């Protein structure tokens, strides 16, 4: 057997058949029992190697904990048809966009189905060009998040606390970039957990929208989108004007008045394909570069 991947309490090996795997499992468990007897007399030996899945095809990424494959046998049962399974990829994240999830799932499935580079790259080129031209489902580009006002509470070293929104919406603290209680600069402010405040993506979207009167602070959730620049918001720590590239609203329909940054979403195609391309030694820039045939030139 050849070990192809291992992580914490699991190991993946290359083996010809389920029968051979079952035989190997039995042999290994017997050897473990010989070397380490069950001296406590437990009903089951404390160390047991279990056979969970047999993949008809498996792809392993170069980053730890990433793999994808087609499972044909699981927990003692042959499946009616191979089941696609993946571990460690962002397509499983709830916070990811439907568009990005779809791209990664598609490229992973093509990979484990052993499609050629040309087949995979051609498919992704179309997805890239569709995104760049805006030929994508609008809702698939949107992210949804819960709104927690606590995440926007800031703390000065002197223990005074204030809302990041108050610092940029007329509160007396906006009069200077210092704490009104102790005089320390706002750059020394942290979150309640003691971390440095950051305003990117969803946080930037909510900051822009609340400051510009598009949302209130009493909401429980919001949706947001990366858009072409639409205005400015004030950074609560530095006091600088920041160009708004993300917008948050209550519903999908509220966002339709904005133009998505399609170049950004097109780049997501390359980003989501990267784990597979890295594993295969391919260049993701090939997704952008469409080769032309002689017929296309003339």
Give, region by region, the residue ranges found by the protein language model.
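DNA-dependent DNA polymerase catalytic subunits
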Residues: 1-8, 13-298
């Amino acid at each position: 057997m050849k070990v192809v991947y291992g992580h914490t309490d699991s190991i993946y090996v290359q083996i010809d058949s389920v029968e051979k795997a079952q035989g190997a499992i039995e042999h290994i468990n017997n050897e473990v029992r010989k070397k380490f007897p069950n001296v406590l007399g437990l009903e089951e030996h404390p160390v047991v190697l279990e056979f969970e899945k047999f993949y008809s095809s498996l792809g392993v990424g170069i980053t730890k904990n990433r793999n994808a494959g087609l499972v044909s046998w699981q927990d003692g049962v042959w499946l009616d048809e191979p089941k696609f399974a993946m571990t460690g990829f962002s397509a499983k994240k709830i916070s990811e966009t439907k568009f990005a999830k779809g791209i990664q799932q598609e490229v992973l499935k093509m990979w484990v189905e052993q499609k050629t580079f040309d087949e995979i790259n051609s498919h992704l080129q179309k997805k890239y060009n569709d995104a760049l031209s805006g030929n994508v489902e609008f809702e698939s580009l949107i992210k949804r998040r819960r709104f927690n006002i606590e995440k926007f509470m800031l703390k000065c070293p002197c223990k005074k606390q204030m809302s990041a929104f108050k610092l940029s919406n007329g509160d007396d603290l906006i009069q200077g970039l210092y704490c009104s209680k102790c005089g320390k600069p706002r750059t020394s402010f942290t979150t309640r957990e003691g971390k440095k405040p950051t305003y990117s993506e969803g946080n930037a979207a909510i900051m822009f929208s609340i400051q510009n009167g598009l949302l209130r602070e009493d909401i429980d959730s919001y949706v947001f989108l990366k858009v072409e620049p639409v205005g400015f918001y004030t950074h609560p720590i530095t006091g600088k004007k920041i160009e708004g590239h993300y917008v948050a609203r209550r519903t999908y329909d509220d966002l339709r008045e904005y133009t998505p940054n399609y170049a950004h979403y097109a780049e997501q195609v390359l980003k989501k394909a990267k784990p597979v391309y890295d594993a295969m030694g391919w260049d993701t820039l090939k997704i952008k570069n469409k080769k032309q045939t002689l017929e296309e030139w003339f």
